Structure formats: structure tokens, C-alpha cells
């Protein structure tokens, strides 16, 4: 359940391009403690001419290490900027937003 949104600083833990124009990024933030897959965060570009955060869905949460995983497609100036971020980069995010969904263990094939 969404307990209110906060603008906080997060740190890029890992990022890689997994397909042309598609990026996999892990962010370290205390917001991970209350996040669930299916919710989303707003990621603010460092370029102050781009005022609004870019909404990106959370696809995985590592609560033990306070990390969120987002996978996004470069679709404009904001996400183009994000694609250049390296581990250690500090970014402003807004979250946690939306409603998540439970992840159930599969029953196998």
C-alpha cells in the first residue's frame, strides 16, 4: 500500500544496456523497504530544463539491500540522460507511487 510519496536521493548501484535502447538499472534507496513490484517511481533528470520526473515501473525489489530495479526504454531526453548514469551516480527520485502486486512462487512446469 502506498503510504505517501517522498522526494529522496538514491544512488545508482548498477546499470547495463540489455538490448538496443533498453536499460536495466538498480537504485539503492531506503524507499525499497516499502516498495513492491508493480509500483513506480519518478526519476528526476539532472538537467534542470526538464522539470518533471519520468515515471518508471519497479520490476524487482531487494529489501535486504535497499535496492529497486527498474528497466526502461530510451524514449526522449530524460531517459537518454539516465542511460549515461554509472554506478555511484546520485539521483533524485519521487516515490513510492501506485499500487503493487504480490509475487507468488511458481508451481513449476
Give the ranges of each region predicted by the language model:
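Ferredoxin-reductase
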Residues: 2-86
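FNR/FR-type flavoprotein reductase catalytic core
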Residues: 80-109
Amino acid at each position: 500500500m502506498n503510504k505517501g510519496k517522498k522526494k529522496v536521493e538514491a544512488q545508482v548501484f548498477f546499470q547495463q544496456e540489455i538490448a538496443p535502447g533498453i536499460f536495466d538499472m538498480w537504485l539503492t534507496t531506503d524507499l525499497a523497504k516499502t516498495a513492491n513490484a508493480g509500483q513506480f517511481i519518478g526519476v528526476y533528470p539532472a538537467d534542470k530544463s526538464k522539470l518533471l520526473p519520468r515515471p518508471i515501473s519497479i520490476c524487482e525489489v531487494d529489501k535486504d539491500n535497499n535496492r529497486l530495479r527498474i528497466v526502461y526504454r530510451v524514449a526522449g531526453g530524460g531517459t537518454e540522460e539516465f542511460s549515461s548514469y554509472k554506478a555511484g551516480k546520485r539521483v533524485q527520485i519521487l516515490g513510492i507511487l501506485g499500487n503493487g502486486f504480490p509475487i507468488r512462487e511458481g508451481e513449476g512446469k
